[in-house]
Amino acid sequence: MHSIDASVERNPNQILLLGRNDPVKGHDFAFQIMNELERRGSNMTLHCTGREEVPEGSSNIVAHGWVSKEEKVKLLQESSLLLLPSAYEGQPMVALEALACGTPVLASNALHSLPDVIFRPGEETLESWVDLIEHIRGRKLVFGDSLTQHSVESINERLLSLYQGLIEPES
């Protein structure tokens, strides 16, 4: 898991979408969000990974393609918000990585197993996502112990305990 690097300056106008180029990841919905933000006069920019190209005429979207782990961490630390508009995910590690970097996360209501510090749009409408982005923008969050139960170590410990209980039942 990553930690916050105080030397990296966060850009209050930078939103991030990390994920492969797959319809389930919600790139197209994120592009709609950016179009609406631009229509409202916002100067926010979406940086997205997993895609080489952006829709024609999109001046507020930057495609990074596939990025290294180091580039991913830098993007997480520079961004003011991570979007997770995915239709479904198992345990979305990218959300936990973002939170570990101090980056707020706005995730689809369809995603479960996330800490309670994740922002949710309420209704899954374009307007509710855009309204919440404008509300969250540039907020500094304090997570406290909320992430501990979702850390890799904690999940591994719980799985190990579960498997040991199955293999070695109590007498």
Residue positions per predicted region:
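Conserved donor-binding/catalytic core segment of Leloir-type glycosyltransferases
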Residues: S7-K25, F31-M34
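A charged, aromatic-enriched C-terminal amphipathic alpha-helix characteristic of glycosyltransferases
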Residues: R137-E170
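Short alpha-helical donor nucleotide-sugar binding micro-motif in glycosyltransferases
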Residues: K74-S79
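Aromatic "clamp/platform" in nucleotide-sugar-dependent glycosyltransferases that forms part
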Residues: A87
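Nucleotide-activated donor-binding/catalytic signature segment of Leloir-type glycosyltransferases, i.e.
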Residues: G50-V73
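Short hydrophobic beta-strand element within catalytic cores of glycosyltransferases
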Residues: A95, P104-A107
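A short hydrophobic beta-strand element within the catalytic core of glycosyltransferases
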Residues: L82-L83
